């Protein structure tokens, strides 16, 4: 009987140890690596062994495989954002110099009077992220958030028409499904806030509200505004009561009102 009980206890102990080991591997916390020099590292989620250079004097967050979850770029770098399928202006220009007139049938060329010409090449869903700023990679290897170096136009809805230009030098943040989560408007833009169906007073505008350029905007996964700066005074409902929101103010929108 004692032997049986001992074996039972040992078996239970082994199970507990195995479960603990499994949990520790599944829920392993990211580790930090201080960079004493600019260093090339592998981002998480990449299936090809390309490296990105991260900036000296910063700290990179690594997963349990030693791949980068987040870090500070050493220089401007083209990367694919999480919502890369929705990127509209996915091209970039390169310059070339010649004394003759070559023919490139596949690419658009902008000519000037000198021996210099520019060619627009597809970036295949990549956008340029600003050097000296932090980026965070998803488990698929795309960028969840980072500072864009150029003005970037993104489709707002996955199955609906509509595009937004986001300001260069600002942070662009994506949901895991690729929808835009947060960014800075490059220009005045008309968008629909959360709860517009029940709270918009003037339906002549079909629920659209004009938001101020260069202001930070936050979206639901469906592309409705939860927070931004309204350009003009706005008549809206809050818990069924009609109110007027001051122009130039940051407004938080909910299903119940503002």
Which stretches of residues belong to each language-model region?
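Terminal low-complexity interaction tails
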Residues: 1-2, 254
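Glycine/tyrosine- and acidic-biased, solvent-exposed loop/turn segments at the edges of beta-strands
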Residues: 28-258
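Bacterial N-terminal signal peptides that target proteins for export
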Residues: 2-15
């Amino acid at each position: 009987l004692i032997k049986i009980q001992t074996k039972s206890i040992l078996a239970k102990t082994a199970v507990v140890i195995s479960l603990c080991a499994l949990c520790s591997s599944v829920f392993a916390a990211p580790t930090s690596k201080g960079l004493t020099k600019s260093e090339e590292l592998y981002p998480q989620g990449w299936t090809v062994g390309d490296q990105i250079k991260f900036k000296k004097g910063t700290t990179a967050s690594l997963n349990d495989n030693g791949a980068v979850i987040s870090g500070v770029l050493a220089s401007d770098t083209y990367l694919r954002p999480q919502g890369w399928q929705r990127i509209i202006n996915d091209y970039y220009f390169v310059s070339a110099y010649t004394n003759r007139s070559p023919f490139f049938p596949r690419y658009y060329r902008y000519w000037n009077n000198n021996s210099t010409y520019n060619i627009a090449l597809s970036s295949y869903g990549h956008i340029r992220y600003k050097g000296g700023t932090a980026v965070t990679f998803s488990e698929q290897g795309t960028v969840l958030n980072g500072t864009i170096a150029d003005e970037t136009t993104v489709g707002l809805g996955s199955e609906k028409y509509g595009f937004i230009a986001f300001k260069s030098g600002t942070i662009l943040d994506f949901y895991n499904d690729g929808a835009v989560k947060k960014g800075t408007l490059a220009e005045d833009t008309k968008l629909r806030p959360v709860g517009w169906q029940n709270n918009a007073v003037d339906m002549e505008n079909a629920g659209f509200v004009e938001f101020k350029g260069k202001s930070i905007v936050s979206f639901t996964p469906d592309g409705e505004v939860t927070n931004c700066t309204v350009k003009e005074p706005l008549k809206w409902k809050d818990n069924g009561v009609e109110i007027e929101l001051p122009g130039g103010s940051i407004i938080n929108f909910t299903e119940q009102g503002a």
